[in-house]
């Protein structure tokens, strides 16, 4: 049975841990607000670029741009995995890694067994996990979220495009966590390349406005495609960053509440042990007094 000193030491230790988790929750809440604002602000721009690409694709031969053209056969795949750099964020990284592993080993199982699936790991956690398990990692960005910058998104997009244009990969998939709300992040697996432009609603029904493009639609597409890829990668990174802070804030809040409950239980145990010790001492005193009276 634990002594009073043991219980008291444990209560003090849990109280110290609770202070840390509470502070981390407050820090994550402050970072979440900024990260959430950045992710939300990036969405309209990314969506508009996608819409413009869809509108232009109806007016040009998309086969003229290789990034818009499907390959007859997918022989090599590049999977981009966006995880965090730090832990203590609940199941955030575990869920992303689970989905990424499924994309690699199940959705592209035959290619994976033939060594035709490569990975690009953005974030330390994913890089550490997949490297230790012998997955083929062609490029990694550990420490990415310690100094998040658009130039890294552009570098990843250019790397993926270059590999696709050279024919070294026939498909690029991105696995990331999309921020929907604090309690409900959404795991996403999206095909980045080849680009499949989405037709806007008016053009689906044939009632689109006849725009005049200057320069030509094909020239605009050649400029728009790299911007689209850069923006999509950047948006995914911002979404993942916001989802990470939300997950960490929730995890630290849960840890703080658990510490509070554990301290409550330990204090009850401490008081009971203290009462038992006092009762034992009183019993010994009474027994001693009775023994003296008997003499």
Swiss-Prot record:
GO terms for cellular component: plasma membrane; proton-transporting ATP synthase complex. GO terms for molecular function: ATP binding; proton-transporting ATP synthase activity, rotational mechanism. Gene3D superfamilies: 3.40.1380.10, ATP synthase, gamma subunit, helix hairpin domain (1.10.287.80). It is a peripheral membrane protein. It comes from the Bacteria. Keywords: ATP synthesis, Cell inner membrane, Cell membrane, CF(1), Hydrogen ion transport, Ion transport, Membrane, Transport. One of its GO terms (biological process) is proton motive force-driven plasma membrane ATP synthesis. F-type ATPases have 2 components, CF(1) - the catalytic core - and CF(0) - the membrane proton channel. CF(1) has five subunits: alpha(3), beta(3), gamma(1), delta(1), epsilon(1). CF(0) has three main subunits: a, b and c. PANTHER family: ATP SYNTHASE GAMMA CHAIN (PTHR11693), ATP SYNTHASE SUBUNIT GAMMA, MITOCHONDRIAL (PTHR11693:SF22). Produces ATP from ADP in the presence of a proton gradient across the membrane. The gamma chain is believed to be important in regulating ATPase activity and the flow of protons through the CF(0) complex. HAMAP family: ATP_synth_gamma_bact. This is ATP synthase gamma chain. The lineage of its organism: Bacteria, Pseudomonadati, Chlorobiota, Chlorobiia, Chlorobiales.
């Amino acid at each position: 049975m634990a002594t009073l000193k043991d219980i008291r030491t444990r209560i003090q230790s849990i109280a110290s841990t609770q202070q840390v988790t509470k502070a981390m929750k407050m820090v994550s809440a402050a970072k979440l607000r900024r990260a959430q604002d950045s992710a939300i602000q990036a969405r309209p721009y990314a969506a508009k670029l996608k819409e413009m690409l869809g509108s232009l694709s109806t007016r040009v031969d998309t086969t003229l741009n290789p990034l818009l053209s499907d390959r007859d056969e997918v022989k090599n795949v590049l999977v981009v995995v966006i995880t965090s750099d730090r832990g203590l964020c609940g199941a955030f990284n575990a869920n992303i890694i689970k989905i990424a592993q499924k994309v690699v080993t199940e959705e592209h199982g035959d290619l994976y067994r033939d060594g035709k699936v490569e990975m690009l790991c953005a974030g330390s956690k994913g890089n550490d996990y997949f490297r230790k398990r012998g997955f083929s990692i062609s490029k990694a960005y550990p420490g990415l979220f310690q100094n998040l910058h658009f130039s890294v998104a552009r570098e990843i997009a250019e790397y993926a495009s270059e590999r696709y244009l050279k024919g070294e990969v026939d498909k690029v998939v991105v696995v990331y966590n999309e921020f929907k709300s604090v309690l409900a992040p959404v795991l996403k697996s999206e095909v980045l390349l080849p680009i499949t432009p989405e037709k806007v609603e008016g053009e689906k029904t044939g009632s689109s406005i006849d725009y005049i493009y200057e320069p030509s639609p094909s020239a605009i597409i050649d400029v728009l495609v790299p911007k689209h890829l850069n923006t999509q990668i950047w948006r995914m990174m911002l979404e993942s960053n916001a989802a990470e802070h939300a997950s960490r804030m929730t995890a630290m809040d849960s840890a703080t509440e658990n510490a509070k409950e554990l301290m409550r239980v330990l204090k009850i145990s401490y008081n009971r042990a203290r009462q038992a010790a006092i009762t034992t001492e009183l019993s010994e005193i009474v027994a001693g007094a009775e023994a003296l009276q008997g003499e």
